[in-house]
C-alpha cells in the first residue's frame, strides 16, 4: 500500500521563538529580554551621554528609554524611564568576537532594564516622546486623547505632569515633536482631528492650530525632517495628507485602496517618504510626485504599524507590525540581482528580520547614540533590546548612479 504523506504542520509561535533563540549567537551582538509588569504601547530611546563607568571591573554604558503602562481599571498608570547598562563592546563599532567566544558571552549576558524614574499618569500611555531640543521635556498622549507634559528636571519623587492639553474627544496614537522648531508638538486622534501645540507656553491650553481634514481615525502624524512647516498624516479614511502650518488647507492628498497606519520622512533625502498599513506592504513615495509610489516592499504577513528611518545609516528603513516581526530594509539594494536560493528568503532589499517577539509589536526605536542598537515592545508585556552582529551590518552603500527617486 502506498504511504500517504501527512501534511506538514505549521510551526507554532513558541517553536518559532525557540528557533530564533538558537540563532541569536550568529545574528546578534546583544539581546536582552525583560518581562514588564504591564504592557507598554510605546517605547523611545532617550539621548544619553556616552560616558562609560566602571562596575566590578567592567566598563558599562548606561542608556535610557521611555515606556508607559496599560493597566487594568483598578491599577495606576505611569510614564516610566528605564535604563540598561551595556558592555562597552556592545556600544562600540569594533569587530565582533568569534562565533564560539560570542556564544559563551551571550549566554552570560544578563543585562536587564531598571526603572529609574516614574511619573503618575491619567489612563494608559498610548505614546511618549521627548522634545529633541530639550530631552528632559516629555510629552505623552492618553486613552482620552489628552496631551500631558512632564519635566525630568523636577526631582520630586511623585511629581506628575506640569501641564495638560485637551482638544481631542477620543483616544489617539499620533504624537510628534517638530525636529527643527522647539516646542511644537503634533497630536492626532481617533476622532479624526490633528492639533498643533506650543508646549513652551503651558499657560495657553488651546491648540495653536487644528487640522480637521480627515473623516475617520488619524493613525499617525510625523514632521518633515528638513522643512519646519511640513508634516504628514495617515488615516482610516484611506488618505495620506501633507500639511503646511502656513496654510489652512492640505497641500497634497493621496487616496489609497488600503488605509495606512504609519508614515516616516527620510532623515537624509528631503523628498523621500515611506508609508505602510493594513495591506502589509511598505511603500516609498517622492513628495514631488506623490500620486504614484516609487516602490513597494513585501515582507510582512500582517498590518504594518510602525515605520522609522535610521538616524545613522542612509537608506535604512525599519518597520514593525502585527505579524510579530521587525524588518530592516536596505533601500540601496532595491533592484539588486538575486540567486534563486536567496529569493526564497525575500526581496533583495529585505536586509534583516527580527523574529524575537511572540505577540504583535507595539513600537520600536533606533538608539540615536549607538548605531544599530534597537528597542522594541510587544503586546504581551515584553521589552527587548537588541543589536545585530557587526559582521552583518555593513553600512548600506548606494551604487554610484543610484537615485531612489527614479524607481518605478
Curated annotation (Swiss-Prot):
Any one GO BP annotation for this protein: chromatin organization
PROSITE patterns with a match to the protein in the record: WD_REPEATS_1, WD_REPEATS_2, WD_REPEATS_REGION
Alphabetical list of InterPro entries matching this protein: G-protein_beta_WD-40_rep, Histone-bd_RBBP4-like_N, WD40/YVTN_repeat-like_dom_sf, WD40_repeat_CS, WD40_repeat_dom_sf, WD40_rpt, WD_repeat_RBAP46/RBAP48/MSI1
Keywords: Chromatin regulator, Cytoplasm, Nucleus, Repeat, WD repeat
Site (Important for interaction with HAT1): 272
Record's signal peptide: none
Cellular component annotations (GO), alphabetically ordered: cytoplasm; nucleus
Repeat (WD) residue spans along the chain: 120-160, 167-207, 213-253, 255-295, 299-339, 356-396
Region (Interaction with the histone H4 N-terminus): 341-345
One Pfam match: CAF1C_H4-bd
Domain of life: Eukaryota
Location of the protein in the cell: Cytoplasm; Nucleus
Function: Regulatory subunit of the histone acetylase B (HAT-B) complex. The complex acetylates 'Lys-12' of histone H4 which is required for telomeric silencing.
Quaternary assembly: Component of the HAT-B complex composed of at least HAT1 and HAT2. The HAT-B complex binds to histone H4 tail.
Family membership: Belongs to the WD repeat RBAP46/RBAP48/MSI1 family.
Name of protein: Histone acetyltransferase type B subunit 2
Organism of this sequence: Kluyveromyces lactis (strain ATCC 8585 / CBS 2359 / DSM 70799 / NBRC 1267 / NRRL Y-1140 / WM37)
Originating gene: HAT2
